[in-house]
Amino acid sequence: MRIALGIQYDGAAFCGWQSQPHGKTVQDALERSLAEFAQTSLHTTVAGRTDTGVHGLGQVVHFDTDLDRADFSWVRGTNAFLPPTVAVQWAKPMPDTFHARFAAFERTYYYALYVHPVRSPMLAGRAGWVHTPLDVDAMREAAAHLVGEHDFSAFRSSECQAKSPVKHLYQIGIRPDGDFIHFRFRANAFLHHMVRNLMGCLVAVGRGRYPSSWLAEVLESRDRDCAAPTFMPEGLYLAHVGYPAEFAVPPAQLGSVPWSSVWADLDGRT
């Protein structure tokens, strides 16, 4: 039997998703808790491996098991052994054709950026921060050069293991909201550090360091050295993983973050 789980976690509490020898990752915490509840080892496969500091709101995993448990039993039982920084949101039996990673056809990330002369300790680990105003119109113009199917080699990390750098970026939405600017990135898939590298470039344009057309030059170069430094992870959230309707994957619970209404309004906007 294949079981899918919807997971939320505070990325600031972990050294990324993927299991490590030190055991301080989201995958390690989840698999330890599943083992406690199921009294057997269960290996999880994830939709997207997030980095240290990156949060999960709509993360999806699957595992195979011979155990027959009620759906909510998996939720309640696993959560009983998880730390407060991780929670299973839902559980659902799936056909063998479902795969958390390979069945997904799109991913959506949001970035919450605090723009203020002084950093806020209340936002530590929850939002990125810049101390100077940003030109939103310039960032929107720059983002328009990136939408579409492109070779995103200039925005991938040296550790990226993806077979192809070609991805289809469907949307970059940018919306100011008081002292915040919110970004929405939606694509069929992302390269390692791709969103944070895109953020670094957009912020550089917003600060006036480069014209909006610079992003087209960076994209065309396919050279990571031509782009801006990788931006901080703290404000980045994996919010949604899209699957074919036949799997009826439950939607992510975005209401758990204070900016959910702003993010909802970003849908379809640029």
Swiss-Prot record:
SUPFAM superfamilies: Pseudouridine synthase
EC top class named in words: isomerase
GO molecular function, one term: tRNA pseudouridine(38-40) synthase activity
EC number: 5.4.99.12
Entry superkingdom: Bacteria
Binding site for substrate: 109
CDD domains membership: PseudoU_synth_EcTruA
Reaction catalyzed: uridine(38/39/40) in tRNA = pseudouridine(38/39/40) in tRNA
Residues the record marks as active site: 51
One GO BP annotation of this record: tRNA pseudouridine synthesis
UniProt keyword tRNA processing, yes or no: yes
Quaternary assembly: Homodimer.
NCBIfam families: hisT_truA
Family: Belongs to the tRNA pseudouridine synthase TruA family.
Task of the protein: Formation of pseudouridine at positions 38, 39 and 40 in the anticodon stem and loop of transfer RNAs.
Cross-referenced PANTHER family: PSEUDOURIDYLATE SYNTHASE, TRNA PSEUDOURIDINE SYNTHASE-LIKE 1
Name used for this protein in its record: tRNA pseudouridine synthase A
